[in-house]
Amino acid sequence: MTVDLHDFVATVEDYPEPGVSFRDISPLMGDGVAYKQAVDAIADFAKHLNVDLIAGPESRGFIVGSPLAYAMNIGFVPARKGGKLPREAVSASYTLEYGGVNELEIHKDAIKPGQRVLIVDDLLATGGTINATREIIEKLGGIVAGVAFIIELESLQGREKIMKAGEVPFLALMEY
């Protein structure tokens, strides 16, 4: 049984600020069939990429990446917000969609040189968190094997920003 994943995305107008249509995947995560379908679709995309690890930025990248890593029987690497990891980490900064700067970090020993990593997140907006995650993976000697999202907000041109950093296989299950 397949479902239309669009039916499981709630749109919240004027959140987090006026003029923004926030796409909330909470209903998708709350429905076992839709959630499994989304994870399985990304796993199907990833199986041809010879992926060693899944990486996801905090926090919804964890929600997509953890079940994906489990389904593929590979490890998951969290890209945490700055200052959240207890051991030596490598970091990168990025500009927030609504202004300001943030930082992501990954433990220094989480990715070995040459490992192929798929970066996943719930939603692609400007591409800042993905490019920061990519920068860290590459600093650690990893190879970004591709990127995958449940939703892409096309008007924010995140895909173009990701590809400007280097072409990689790309998947978005839904575009808005």
Curated annotation (Swiss-Prot):
Keywords assigned by UniProt, alphabetized: Cytoplasm, Glycosyltransferase, Purine salvage, Transferase
Catalyzed reactions per annotation: AMP + diphosphate = 5-phospho-alpha-D-ribose 1-diphosphate + adenine
InterPro entries the UniProt entry points to: Ade_phspho_trans, PRibTrfase_dom, PRTase-like, UPRTase/APRTase
Localization of this protein: Cytoplasm
Annotated GO biological process: adenine salvage; AMP salvage; purine ribonucleoside salvage
Biochemical pathway: Purine metabolism; AMP biosynthesis via salvage pathway; AMP from adenine: step 1/1
Tagged with keyword Cytoplasm: yes
Record EC number: 2.4.2.7
Major enzyme class: transferase
Pfam families linked: Pribosyltran (PF00156)
The keyword Glycosyltransferase is annotated on this UniProt entry: yes
Description of how the protein assembles with itself and partners: Homodimer.
Function of the protein: Catalyzes a salvage reaction resulting in the formation of AMP, that is energically less costly than de novo synthesis.
Family matches, as HAMAP family: Aden_phosphoribosyltr (MF_00004)
Protein name in the entry: Adenine phosphoribosyltransferase
Gene this chain is encoded by: apt
